[in-house]
Amino acid sequence: VAVGDVRDSLAAFGERYLRKVFTAGEVSDCNGRNRVHSLAARFAAKEAVIKAFAEPDMPFPLREIEVTLDGPLPQLRLSGTVAERARHQGWVSSSLSLSHAECHAMAVVLVVCRQADSE
């Protein structure tokens, strides 16, 4: 994700952009020195989650994909229709890695699914 795109969205839409894309917890966690970079990394995580689904072209409410900092490593918290889709596809657990540089932020999501029943 281009950090400049997130910066431009914040400049153009402000709080409306934040409320549409991020949870209150994510916004609070990003209120530091590298705010735009941290928000861009969370946006990258949301994109990575969507791509991990077998049907990534379906609509996904971005606020139902949350990056939390409950411990030393970032975690994913899914809710609503996104959590239901994950259960339907057999998601058992996930791991998340975030990083950012001057111009870009990136995320990798690894999902473990239960083994499909053989017929």
Name what the model sees in each region:
Residues V1-E119:
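Core catalytic alpha/beta fold that binds nucleotide/phospho-ligands
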